[in-house]
């Protein structure tokens, strides 16, 4: 099992997380991607290396998506056949939940499944106070919106589309490396594409842990939300345009060819549905999301 943690300007929470993971399973490979944090944060990464953590470094900040792809490529080249579990650097994922997702991912890998195992934040932390379990308003609104729009666009219900705790079976690593997006949109794009790429989405309940004020988060609400929603809007727009325009054009052509109205309506709907499926499939595989 490889535990992949992208990190940008982390604090000691990352060191504590790595030590807790090492204590729980000394055999697990912990891989941290320093996403251009800069010299001021070098002592933290040095401390991680001393503790036996593998650290790969981007010379400049590229974004979470790029850091995840760097880690996936490293794992594929250096530890082929192993599952990958991603976690956030701010300590919002408990070690026991990280390993729960990892074990479930290993089970799927042994079965030869193409799977993404999602740690969905639905369980309160019994060891945290009121502030430690209270979901920030922007996170609550953002996740509720993406859950709803994701279901509308794909027909799939995922309780936590923004979770950073995910398990990947080795069967999908090549596919993951082909998904575009260097920042936060990468994680959402993989979920959209999974619904069209025969990749199973499995949900595992985990404890929700939030730091008051989330001081170590580098998420920019406006810019990064726009990036996340761009692939979703492209997906929905393609569905509307192909559905409405193709439907109307096909109906006009079929009626013009002399088909009875009922036959023309049914034929137009079939043509529209096939076109919609084809366009969405191209969108998901050729860089539209």
Question: Model-derived features: where do they sit?
Answer:
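Conserved short acidic donor-positioning loop in nucleotide-sugar-dependent glycosyltransferases
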Residues: 9, 35-39, 62, 71
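Acceptor/aglycone-binding surface of glycosyltransferases and processive sugar-polymer synthases
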Residues: 59-60, 66-74, 95-184, 211-219, ...
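Cell-envelope/extracellular polymer assembly enzymes that use nucleotide-activated donors
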Residues: 1-2, 29, 189
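Hydrophobic helical membrane-anchoring modules
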Residues: 11, 179-256, 269-289
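Short beta-strand-to-loop acidic/aromatic patch adjacent to the donor-nucleotide binding site
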Residues: 81-92
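Conserved donor nucleotide-binding strand/loop of the catalytic core
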Residues: 46-81
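Short, well-formed alpha-helical segments that are part of the catalytic scaffolds
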Residues: 9-23
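A conserved acidic beta->alpha catalytic loop
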Residues: 34-43, 91
């Amino acid at each position: 099992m490889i535990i992949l943690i992208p990190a940008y300007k982390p604090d000691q929470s990352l060191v504590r997380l790595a030590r807790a993971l090492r204590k729980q399973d000394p055999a697990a490979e912990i891989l941290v991607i320093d996403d251009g944090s800069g010299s001021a944060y070098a002592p933290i990464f040095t401390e991680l290396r001393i503790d036996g953590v593998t650290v790969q470094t981007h010379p400049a900040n590229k974004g979470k998506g790029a850091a995840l792809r760097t880690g996936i490529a490293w794992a594929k080249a250096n530890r082929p056949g192993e599952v990958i579990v991603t976690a956030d650097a701010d300590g919002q994922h408990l070690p026991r939940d990280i390993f729960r997702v990892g074990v479930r991912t290993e089970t799927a890998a042994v079965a030869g499944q193409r799977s993404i195992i999602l740690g969905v934040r639905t369980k309160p932390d019994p060891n945290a106070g009121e502030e430690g379990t209270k979901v920030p308003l922007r996170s609550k609104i953002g996740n509720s919106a993406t859950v709803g729009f994701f279901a509308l666009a794909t027909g799939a219900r995922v309780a936590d589309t923004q979770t950073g705790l995910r398990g990947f079976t080795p069967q999908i690593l090549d596919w993951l490396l082909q998904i575009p997006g260097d920042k936060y949109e990468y994680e959402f794009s993989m979920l959209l594409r999974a619904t069209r790429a025969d990749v199973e989405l499995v949900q595992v309940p985990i404890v929700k842990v939030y730091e008051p004020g989330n001081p170590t988060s580098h998420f920019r609400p406006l810019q990064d939300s726009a990036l996340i929603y761009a692939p979703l809007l492209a997906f929905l727009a393609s569905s509307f345009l192909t559905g409405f325009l193709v439907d109307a054009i096909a109906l006009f052509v079929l009626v013009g060819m002399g088909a009875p109205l009922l036959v023309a309506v049914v034929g137009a709907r079939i043509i529209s549905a096939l076109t919609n499926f084809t366009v969405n499939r191209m969108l998901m595989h050729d860089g539209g999301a």
